[in-house]
Amino acid sequence: MSNGAPFPLDYRGTRNYGPRFIPDRYSTFVSSARKSPRTPPGGSDQVVHVNDAGVYKRTFAVASPFPKSEFFYSSVGVGDAIGAMTDTKKHRVRRSILGPRLRAKAIAPYTPSLQKLVIACMDIMAGKARQGKVINLLRYTRALTVDVISDFTFGRPMGVVNEAEEMPDLLNDLEVFGRHFHILKHFPISRKLLDIIPESFARKLMPLPGFFELREKATTAVNEAVVERQAGKTISNNTDGASFLDLLLNQIDENPSVLVDEGCAFITGGSDTTGFTMENATYLILSHPHILQSLLQELDTSPHIRDTFDLDHILRLPFLTAIIKETLRLYTPAPSPLPRTVPAEGIDVHGHFLPGGTILTHSLYLIHHNPVLFADPKSFKPERWLGTQGKVLEQYYVPFSKGSRSCIGMALAYHEVYTYLSLLFSRFEMEIFETSQSDMDWREHFFVKRNGQLRIRIVRDRWTGEAFPTRAVEADLR
């Protein structure tokens, strides 16, 4: 423990690579502790980062007495959303409303719609390839994930997949806001000011590019849904299940600002992390030819992808599953330390007593990169998840966190990633185009943002045999 350590929730520096630098500075299980400039009223003056899987299991267990820390989650810009709730009773009620809609069995009827969106993305990508253009993969993965999560949230997709622009406005707003998320995180007063001052003044006062545009789009969607509801119409346009707005309006009398918070949170969290995983998996597979060949062998021998798409079967493909797990381990989508508040009785951590009110943080990234748990943790080794060894490692596999506050959208995210990867690699022969490891390195803004972009060139359509121009030209990226 060190009182001279940098504030563990503030890793911004010149390179801003977040928790990856903690193990280099601290070799003990307690990585850092210091007086926090943002201590909650009546709380302890310590923020302690613990890099210990056993303590993590205790802190993040089901019905854990360690609640989310209000001083942090109230500042993230969507305080009324389920992911930011710090009141355990309110969270339990909200999860009981939304949780059943996001279980695997409830999602299953959506598979044909999901498959249709993925194929639409790939058809557009093939059209670009015919023109000899390079594919900016983020444009298509984020369009796909935004359309999926908006369909679940508002009852209709936002239609980003089929927009003609190289970078549609909504995707640009999400990307820009993601890169400025740290402003809300490190200056929590800015979120409170947004609630009490006119928006026109707030836009000039606070440098939050993308935030206002995102809330404006979510507000429009919520207002349209409420008007339809008042007219006696069902909000959802699809037959695969009720939208989140339907469910919330059925169960509780929520005011529009709460619904907007929930909408913004689902759109941001449900698109950014899933799209990030799709891109990382694509890069890692194409960067390791022997892994690509093993994956193609598994996909090509399956009759449940091209001919009759059977997601239940695809979810059980062992090597594809190993690739996805290893991608989520190596590139954990939410690496930022997750703060929890120590209950009143305190906790003993390996001989260190932490009093009630202490802010205790854990990083999922550090668990996934602990060399004691994962041999050669910086290497991409999907085979570690196969057989008996893989079953042993499951207890330390936490990309969506654990316990009562684990990611509510986990099953939907898996459905999207499995569908995307199985169809993409079954259909296209691809290669990485002028993308370096430096481009793939990330910066922590609670979620993660890369230094550069992943660009690929599609060489051939394996389903039709069509070969695309071998001399690719830069896409017109904005």
From Swiss-Prot:
Gene3D superfamilies reported for this sequence: Cytochrome P450
Top-level lineage group: Eukaryota
Biological-process GO terms, alphabetical: secondary metabolite biosynthetic process
CDD domains: CYP58-like
Cofactor requirements of the protein: heme
Gene Ontology MF terms: heme binding; iron ion binding; monooxygenase activity; oxidoreductase activity, acting on paired donors, with incorporation or reduction of molecular oxygen
Residues binding heme: 407
EC code: 1.-.-.-
Cited function: Cytochrome P450 monooxygenase; part of the gene cluster that mediates the biosynthesis of the aspoquinolone mycotoxins. The role of asqL within the aspoquinolone pathway has still to be determined. The first step of the pathway is catalyzed by the nonribosomal peptide synthetase asqK that condenses anthranilic acid and O-methyl-L-tyrosine to produce 4'-methoxycyclopeptin. 4'-methoxycyclopeptin is then converted to 4'-methoxydehydrocyclopeptin by the ketoglutarate-dependent dioxygenase asqJ. AsqJ also converts its first product 4'-methoxydehydrocyclopeptin to 4'-methoxycyclopenin.
Family statement drawn from the similarity comment of this UniProt entry: Belongs to the cytochrome P450 family.
Protein name (Swiss-Prot/TrEMBL): Cytochrome P450 monooxygenase asqL
Taxonomic lineage of the native organism: Eukaryota, Fungi, Dikarya, Ascomycota, Pezizomycotina
